[in-house]
Amino acid sequence: MKSSDIDQDLFTDSYCKVCSAQLISESQRVAHYESRKHASKVRLYYMLHPRDGGCPAKRLRAENGSDADMVDKNKCCTLCNMSFTSAVVADSHYQGKIHAKRLKLLLGEKPPLKTTAAPLSSLKAPRVDTAPVVASPYQRRDSDRYCGLCAAWFNNPLMAQQHYEGKKHKKNAARVALLEQLGTSLDLGELRGLRRTYRCTTCSVSLNSIEQYHAHLQGSKHQTNLKNK
């Protein structure tokens, strides 16, 4: 019996004897014969059955030497050491990832490097509010490199954007807004934030932060004392 007849008997359209696999559909058949598991079992089978002449791919190489043009590509791929039962299975293999990958390695091509860096066009410029807070002397022309309000430097626009949207900057901006709003009731040292206490002369009390000072001014006690003064 010829080796090709043996191959046809082992690998049919509905059953793979080497893998003991039932093949119901065309897609299942192609997927099975293309799989690495099948290729490994086929190589093992021919190693254990030398009377069949060994693996078809190896046998064709030995008979034809380095002349790859003499090999029937519909029956065997010498590059991947795989045998096929039909032209459809062979065509599926040659268009698959495994064959393409080995072909690139053979030609010395390197796979493309994946990059996670975002293109410059996708980077958003830092948002600059038009409110008086940001338009204060703390704001500089190079706001994408430095935040005068928080004394923070940036390496790129994306880092600047993240800073301006962060809690620290928003907290400092709100603090400056209160300072500017309360500028008429604070002395120069308090307005510049150089003091740790803020005094209300109307009520004769000292507050530890600008937030407490602002809350005190909105309170009923201060409003009452202000009216009675």
From Swiss-Prot:
> Which top-rank group of organisms is this from?
Eukaryota
- Single GO MF descriptor: zinc ion binding
Q: Where in the cell is it found?
A: Nucleus
Query: In its keyword annotation, does this UniProt entry include Nucleus?
Result: yes
Record's keyword terms, sorted: DNA-binding, Metal-binding, Nucleus, Repeat, Zinc, Zinc-finger
> Where on this chain are zinc fingers (Matrin-type) annotated?
14-44, 72-106, 145-175, 198-228
Entries under SMART domains matching the protein: ZnF_C2H2, ZnF_U1
Q: What is the predominant subcellular site recorded for this chain?
A: nucleus
User: SUPFAM superfamilies, per this entry?
Assistant: beta-beta-alpha zinc fingers
Cross-referenced InterPro entries, in alphabetical order? Matrin/U1-C_Znf_C2H2 (IPR000690), Matrin/U1-like-C_Znf_C2H2 (IPR003604), ZN346_ZMAT4 (IPR051868), Znf_C2H2_jaz (IPR022755), Znf_C2H2_sf (IPR036236), Znf_C2H2_type (IPR013087)
Question: Which Pfam families does the record cross-reference, listed alphabetically?
Answer: zf-C2H2_jaz, zf-met
Q: Which GO terms describe its cellular component?
A: nucleus
Q: What is this protein called?
A: Zinc finger matrin-type protein 4
Q: Which organism is it from?
A: Mus musculus
Its lineage reads:
Eukaryota, Metazoa, Chordata, Craniata, Vertebrata
